[in-house]
């Protein structure tokens, strides 16, 4: 923290040897827009009486962190809704070189010895599908989800259509 840094500089406190200095961290991000998009889905509960669960797909450009098109669906995470989200973004912004996803059934299954429908669809589009096995990908999607969830929670949507309108507003 800043206070710990000031105390260390003043010679009043010892630096915590167990922590690496922040300046030693290497930021992992692509250099150019459309080199890599990241797609991830997460469950969101509506503010209706049964607390209906929906799935929100968030698609983000890795270099710019621009939200390319978040969409909400009533079904659990699946390849069809993921491809719908991707197709809308590709129609608007063009194709990325690569798409990074988690290892969910809807996205990347090649490491299990088979290709998902989404992976085959991406290959037909000329897009490389990659899955995030390394720690360098951790946190980006989750941080974006956290910000989006706070935005939605503050507005307490009760319907899928209301969530989609809020997602469109969030992107603007």
Mark where each language-model region is.
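An active-site-proximal beta-strand-loop segment
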Residues: 39-68, 76-79
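Active-site beta-loop-alpha junctions of metal-dependent nucleic acid enzymes
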Residues: 52-55, 70-98
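Basic, flexible linker segments flanking DNA-binding modules
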Residues: 1-39, 44-45, 116, 135
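An acidic- and aromatic-residue-enriched active-site/binding cleft used to recognize and process polar
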Residues: 62, 72-75, 104, 127, ...
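Charged alpha-helix within mobile-element recombinases
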Residues: 117-172
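Short, solvent-exposed loop/turn segments at secondary-structure boundaries
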Residues: 50, 71-72, 108-113
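Mobile genetic element proteins and their domesticated derivatives, centered on retroelements
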Residues: 3, 40, 59, 65, ...
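Acidic/histidine-rich, metal-coordinating catalytic segments
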Residues: 90-111, 133
């Amino acid at each position: 923290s800043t206070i710990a840094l000031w105390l260390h500089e003043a010679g009043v406190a010892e630096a915590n040897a167990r922590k690496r200095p922040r300046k030693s961290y290497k930021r992992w991000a692509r250099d150019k827009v459309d080199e890599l998009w990241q797609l991830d889905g997460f469950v969101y509960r509506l503010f209706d009486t049964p607390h209906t669960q929906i799935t929100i797909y968030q698609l983000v450009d890795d270099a710019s962190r621009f939200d390319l098109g978040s969409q909400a669906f009533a079904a659990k995470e699946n390849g069809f809704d993921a491809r719908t989200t991707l197709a809308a973004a590709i129609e608007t912004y063009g194709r990325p070189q690569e798409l990074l996803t988690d290892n969910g059934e809807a996205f990347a299954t090649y490491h299990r010895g088979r290709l998902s429908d989404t992976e085959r669809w991406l290959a037909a589009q000329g897009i490389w599908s990659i899955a995030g096995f390394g720690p360098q990908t951790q946190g980006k999607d989750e941080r974006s989800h956290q910000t989006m969830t706070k935005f939605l929670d503050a507005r307490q949507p009760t319907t899928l259509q209301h969530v989609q309108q809020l997602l469109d507003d969030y992107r603007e």
